């Protein structure tokens, strides 16, 4: 009986193998189907990028804290950290440093374990409230966005990606310029610093090398010197050693003879337009009271031009015609020059007056005198796209001028 069963099982296996071979032959005769093309969804890429931002948020916060310490945004904290690190680097031995590293490894593990162990278990009602009123990190894949929100997310991601790639390319170009000696001064400084670092590592102990590196990071940046300058200025102001700036004495008016009554002779065919008034406003002499002289010169220049644009009607004398034209010109110039001259210059601190006119920076909007706000830049530098923006210029302060021309 068992022998018959074994024969039956063997026959069934042979039949199955024959059917499989026949089917395999038919399958091999058919051409293989082309592989399915991999689909690329830009919105999924953006979601993954946002999730990565959430996961790396603690590292970003730590980097921001380190950057704030190195930039001396809080001078007292930066000073304490710098001195504390130097003290630890110079006093701790090798065994103590291994203990500190072990503590740094165990501390996050212990904090995570305690947080999970002693975490307050929320009630069912609290869980329902969190479910309907919060979005968790694991729920980001199931969030349904509208088309406008998706496009906004994709656009923001592409802008950030473009900025990151631009900065990376700029840094790579700077490295290549140093390596290929395009700027011999910078390249010599770089290789000299490398050789000096190797010599210091060979001659000095490691603790001293780390202390020098820490001091260089904290003390060798421009923010530290800015803090020192501010501290020095505050100390001088508190002690009263800084002399007060004396106000400029007004110049004595020169005696002038009464000009004869005469009509202005037409010297050009230029009409009084806003562009001509703006060009007259931009003219700057180099005298002490250039604003007052500029106002007088522009008034006479524009009055001569205005005489051509308004013909005589025959019922008024020449003096009446001139007075009417000058009154209209004065109204136009009053719009150009504000009557409120109170305040001080942001740059030099000079008080605005009739002789010291106020001028606003076209980039930052702060109020300056004509000496501090005397730099001209094209409007195209500030983002204007009109064709005339390449030719038209506006006044900016010195700080904005340095920022815009870079």
UniProtKB/Swiss-Prot annotation:
SMART domains tied to this protein: FYVE (SM00064)
Membrane-spanning residues: 72-92, 94-114
Location of the region described as Disordered in the Swiss-Prot/TrEMBL record: 239-295
Residues engaged in binding Zn(2+) 1: 345, 348, 369, 372
Comp. bias regions, Pro residues: 250-263
GO biological process entries: endoplasmic reticulum tubular network formation; neuron projection development; neurotrophin TRK receptor signaling pathway; positive regulation of axon extension; protein localization to plasma membrane; vesicle-mediated transport
GO molecular function annotation: zinc ion binding
Keywords: Cell membrane, Cell projection, Endoplasmic reticulum, Endosome, Membrane, Metal-binding, Transmembrane, Transmembrane helix, Zinc, Zinc-finger
Lumenal side: 93
Segments for region (Sufficient for homooligomerization): 1-97
Membrane topology classification: Multi-pass membrane protein
GO cellular component, one term: recycling endosome membrane
Keyword Coiled coil attributed: no
Segments for region (Sufficient for localization to endoplasmic reticulum tubular network): 1-210
Cell compartment(s), UniProt: Recycling endosome membrane; Endoplasmic reticulum membrane; Cell projection, Growth cone membrane
UniProt-annotated binding residues for Zn(2+) 2: 361, 364, 397, 400
Cytoplasmic side: 1-71, 115-192, 214-406
Functional description taken from the UniProt entry: Key regulator of RAB11-dependent vesicular trafficking during neurite extension through polarized membrane transport. Promotes axonal elongation and contributes to the establishment of neuronal cell polarity. Involved in nerve growth factor-induced neurite formation in VAPA-dependent manner. Contributes to both the formation and stabilization of the tubular ER network. Involved in ER morphogenesis by regulating the sheet-to-tubule balance and possibly the density of tubule interconnections.
Subunit structure: Can form homooligomers (monomers, dimers and tetramers).
Name used for this protein in its record: Protrudin
Species for this entry: Gallus gallus (Chicken)
